[in-house]
Amino acid sequence: MTLEMRMVELETRQAFQDDTIQALNDVVVEQARVIERLQLQMAELIKRHEEMVGQYGSEGEEAPPPHY
């Protein structure tokens, strides 16, 4: 294998690796966006849950059923 052929092979591999790295980076960026949205949704759900518990009292504060 000549030096020129080796250079072409290495440049070709690098081009494919660059494409793969970019594709993986795109996936990571999208996953980060999804995680951020999920964190915001989770925070909103926690806030709603705390508001509901505040309105209706916690489960530990319930009076025992009438048959006790």
From Swiss-Prot:
Alphabetized HAMAP family for the sequence: SlyX
PANTHER family (UniProt xref): PROTEIN SLYX (PTHR36508:SF1)
Gene3D superfamilies according to UniProt: 1.20.5.300
Descriptive protein name: Protein SlyX homolog
Stated family: Belongs to the SlyX family.
NCBIfam families in the record: PRK00295.1
Native organism: Pseudomonas putida (strain ATCC 47054 / DSM 6125 / CFBP 8728 / NCIMB 11950 / KT2440)
InterPro entries hit by this protein: SlyX (IPR007236)
Superkingdom as given in the UniProt entry: Bacteria
